[in-house]
Amino acid sequence: SGRYDGGYDLLRQERVTQAEKLGVIPEGATLANYEPLATPWNELSLEQQRRYSRAQEIYASVLEYMDMSIGRIIDYLEETGQLDNTLVLFASDHGGSASESGVDPAASLRDTVNRDNSFENFGRPMSYIDHGEGFAEAATAPFRDYKATLSEGGLRAASFISYPAAIPGGDVSHTFLSLM
């Protein structure tokens, strides 16, 4: 049993609840105007659920590794006395990817040529997988849709700025930011 075996609908609700607790979105925020584009989790076959769940576990582990690596840089800056005078800017790519690569064998011929997307090879060399539409929708909660759409889920992305010498920490800003 994996962390994401409950599916993307459950994960979406968990993320909204956590975002409320952290003050990122107002308490009592709803998933208004949310019309899931992905097949409901309970309508997927057990094999489909297994593939999507495993792909999401791999995706999450990549993010966890990135987070740990950024932490190592921050730790180094702190240990060497440079953190207070260093501007740290992190910006995520827009929206969650809805690609079905690897999880849906019919997704694209391009995703299967010279690939081994067997379940046993997920996340290993020669695999080319993504976590699919449902987990992309969960990734952008509480917003609607995902990457490549003109909705908040496709346009908004997480970011943070830290510059202890000039910016007080601990605040959440909803100010529009563009890196273009």
Predicted regions and their residues:
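Substrate-binding rim/cap in mid-to-C-terminal beta-strand-loop elements of soluble/periplasmic
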Residues: 2, 74-75, 112-180
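Active-site-proximal loop/short-helix segments
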Residues: 1, 90-98
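Short helix/loop capping segments that flank catalytic or ligand/cofactor-binding pockets
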Residues: 28-29, 99-100, 153, 170
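Long, well-ordered, tryptophan-enriched scaffold segments
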Residues: 1-3, 9-44
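A long, amphipathic alpha-helix that forms part
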Residues: 6-12, 17-21, 48-86, 96-98, ...
